[in-house]
Amino acid sequence: MKDNRDYIGYGSKDFSFEWPNKSKLALQFVLNYEEGAENSILNGDTSSESFLSEIVNAKPIQGNRHMNMESIYEYGSRRGFWRIHKEFKRRNLPLTIFGVGMALEKNPDVCEQIIKSDYEVASHGYRWIDYQNIDEQTEIEHTILCNKLINKIFGYYPSGWYTGRTS
């Protein structure tokens, strides 16, 4: 296998960049919305989720549900989104939602608040799964499905794309 990584980058050259209006700091607030799209036998997967949780060294449970893992993910849709949404509305702050298509499908109330709040929606994929070993055609289909789904729900195609898992 040929190593084609870039180990040099800018090297010794200084990188100079100036933000508009000579600003010193630019912030973007992003909320990942993934709940319900993770690995689960309820979604037709062979095992439960094991990625990004408070469970140290979590292992997928084959052929069965992982109730602790599901509870951790469900917190985001049941309380997490609403607490963050309330605070952002109180402070009149803009927010970008990195929305996973299947997760958005499962919670119309969250989608309604995203619309009412005029939050920007970027695609975070159709499923919250590791795509590294998924065939290319399925990944393409999921990309198209998610884009169409976001357009159907929000009336526009996603403003951007961020795949948060290996692809």
What is each residue range found by the language model?
Residues K2-S167:
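Catalytic alpha-helical scaffold of carbohydrate-active enzymes acting on polysaccharides/glycoconjugates
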